[in-house]
């Protein structure tokens, strides 16, 4: 499995700011969007382009345009919504699919509760977004679902990943690509990433 930890100084700076214990909801949201945007820039660097002639200000001009790439952005509810606007900044015409999965805090197992997948998913690249890759259970369940629907091309974008989650994801889906802002130390006894960001969903939505 291709794993890319984006080491750009802006990404490292912003993910560092997100680790503040008393960060405000407003600031956390802003940074989640910004880092999501920067990860998208990296994850789409292999998109093919083609030459297209357009009417410029001084007559015809040949420009590069992305070559017929169909994309669906797939936020995992609810925390994935915090990254969605940053991703869509670069691809405002992308279709959005939604998958609702939460992690049972006792068993740490994923529990699906909602799905709305775009049509023709088999023709699209799916960019699955979620702030945290902890045990990997929710991400694996989401990718299982997308593949059952016919999706054949999947990239995962997360803010912070634990080695345990990366290992589990690679074992289940070695054909996907993972882009993250940081690979952290690991999981604590409660299954939270350390040092991590805390509960990203609560910080994005202002809940506890």
From Swiss-Prot:
Record-level GO BP terms: UMP salvage; uracil salvage
Binding site for 5-phospho-alpha-D-ribose 1-diphosphate: 78, 103, 130-138, 199
Cofactor: Mg(2+)
Membrane-spanning ranges: none
Catalytic reactions of this protein: UMP + diphosphate = 5-phospho-alpha-D-ribose 1-diphosphate + uracil
Pathway this chain belongs to: Pyrimidine metabolism; UMP biosynthesis via salvage pathway; UMP from uracil: step 1/1
Molecular function per GO: GTP binding; magnesium ion binding; uracil phosphoribosyltransferase activity
Cofactor binding, note field: Binds 1 Mg(2+) ion per subunit. The magnesium is bound as Mg-PRPP.
Positions that bind uracil: 193, 198-200
InterPro entries: PRibTrfase_dom, PRTase-like, Upp_B, UPRTase/APRTase, Ura_phspho_trans
Keyword Magnesium set for record: yes
rRNA processing as UniProt keyword: no
Name of a matching Pfam family: UPRTase
Keyword annotations of the record: Allosteric enzyme, Glycosyltransferase, GTP-binding, Magnesium, Nucleotide-binding, Transferase
Activity modulation comment: Allosterically activated by GTP.
Entry EC number(s): 2.4.2.9
Function of the protein: Catalyzes the conversion of uracil and 5-phospho-alpha-D-ribose 1-diphosphate (PRPP) to UMP and diphosphate.
Family membership noted in the UniProt record: Belongs to the UPRTase family.
Protein name: Uracil phosphoribosyltransferase
Gene: upp
